[in-house]
Swiss-Prot record:
Residues spanning the signal sequence: none
A GO CC term assigned to this protein in UniProt: ribonucleoprotein complex
NCBIfam families, sorted: rpmJ_bact
GO BP annotation list: translation
InterPro entries, alphabetized: Ribosomal_bL36, Ribosomal_bL36_sp
A family per Pfam: Ribosomal_L36
UniProt family annotation: Belongs to the bacterial ribosomal protein bL36 family.
UniProt keyword list: Ribonucleoprotein, Ribosomal protein
Keyword Ribonucleoprotein among UniProt keywords: yes
GO molecular function, one term: structural constituent of ribosome
PROSITE patterns documented for this protein: RIBOSOMAL_L36
Name of the protein described by the UniProt record: Large ribosomal subunit protein bL36
Organism field: Hahella chejuensis (strain KCTC 2396)
PANTHER family, A to Z: 50S RIBOSOMAL PROTEIN L36, CHLOROPLASTIC, LARGE RIBOSOMAL SUBUNIT PROTEIN BL36C
Name of the coding gene: rpmJ
Length: 38
């Protein structure tokens, strides 16, 4: 999980979601693409 100021989609499998007020990226194809804004 990377914590970044701005989260971006890195590939086709990435999806931007909101959990508990935080913007996150989850990826089905590449788990290393997981990101959290903060």
């Amino acid at each position: 999980m990377k914590v970044r100021a701005s989260v971006k989609k890195m590939c086709r499998g990435c999806k931007i979601i909101r959990r508990n007020g935080a913007v996150m990226v989850i990826c089905s194809t590449e788990p290393r693409h997981k990101q959290k804004q903060g």
